[in-house]
Amino acid sequence: MKSLKLTALLLAIFFASNITAQMSDECRVNLSLFTEYAKVKNYADAYEPWMKVYTECPSASKNIYSLGVRILEWKIKQATTQEEFNAAFAQLMKLYDDRIQYYGNDPKTPRPAILADKATKHNK
C-alpha cells in the first residue's frame, strides 16, 4: 500500500513538472514573439503573445512592462470608441502597477521612477 501511494505521488510530481516545463516553453516562445514584433513596431502582431506572457508569466522579463507600455500606447491610439480607449488606458495604468509589483526594486528603474512615468501618462 505504501509503495502504491509513493508511486502515485511520484507520478503526480512528474506530470506537474512536465506541465510547468510546457508552460515555461510557451512563455518563452510568446516572449520571443512579442519582443521581436515590438522591436520592429509591429504592435498589432505583438499584442496577443504579449497578453499571454503578461497574464500567464508576469515575472518572466522586464520587457513585458517596458515594451508593454509601447504596445498599449499603440492600442490607445487605435481605439475608435471611448470604451476601447478607456479599456486600453486602464490596462496601461494596471501595467505600471504590476511593474512595481514585479520589478519595483530594480535599481535602473525603481518604484518612484515607475510612478512618475505613470503620472505623466495619466496626465496626458
Where are these regions (language model features)?
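Basic side chains
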Residues: K2-K5, R99, K118
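Structured catalytic/translocation cores of nucleotide/phosphate-coupled proteins
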Residues: A21-D25, F34, A38, A46-E48, ...
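Amphipathic alpha-helical repeat scaffolds of TPR domains
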Residues: M23-T35, P58-Q78, G104-K124
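Helix-turn-helix repeat elements of alpha-solenoid scaffolds
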Residues: A38-M51, E84-D97
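Short, polar/flexible loop-turn hinges at active-site or ligand-entry regions and domain interfaces
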Residues: A79-E83
